[in-house]
Amino acid sequence: MKELIQEERAIVWYLSHHREATSNQMLESDSPYAELLSPYFQPESSDLQSWMEFPYEQNKKYPEQKIYGTSAGIHVRSKSESMIVYLLYDYKIPFRYECALELGQVTAYPDFTIRHPKTGKLFIWEHFGMMDDPTYRRNALSKLQLYMEHGWIPSVNLLLTYETKEYPLDMAYVEGVIKDYFVK
């Protein structure tokens, strides 16, 4: 009987001191629980869908080079980018193509800006498709340096794929990247 009385007191104390909070309130950015809980809760998919569809500043350079149509209804510059779009779209991973990203005084346009479908975490994906070309390779390394100077870390929040004529991008590899980072 003594244990029941102690248990009742504990319940009464808990109820009198417990703050009502919804799971959404616990996940708000100023909540002490947000960092702890966010990996385990999926933001509302409608929010991610809205983010994907919301107008954004895109790269306006060389629109005539966007010749490859995709299943997502956008045009991209290369077959490899169309492969990435196909798989992102197929796995329902929210993304933007060539979305403006401010890096200090420079505006970059990463190939893909991606939101993790469960956590909402932001990733960027650069596909470097002409690594045979020395000028292209130099520019790619310069871009990579700029990203790292602004907190975009390879394999953490910056995904990188490369190809040459001898070693083209492989669909199975792209699918593996998507599964490793976004489908767990």
Which ranges hold each PLM region?
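Short beta-strand-loop-alpha-helix junction that forms the active-site gateway
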Residues: 109, 113-143
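Alpha-helical scaffold elements within enzyme catalytic domains, especially in hydrolases
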Residues: 3, 87, 91-93, 146-149
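Amphipathic alpha-helical coiled-coil segments
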Residues: 1-11, 15
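Solvent-exposed, charged helical/coil patches
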Residues: 24-93
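C-terminal structured domain segments
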Residues: 131, 138-154, 165
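Basic, glycine-rich
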Residues: 149-184
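Coiled-coil heptad-register positions
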Residues: 12-15, 19-26, 30
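Active-site metal-binding core of divalent-cation-utilizing nuclease and nuclease-like domains
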Residues: 74-76, 89, 93-119
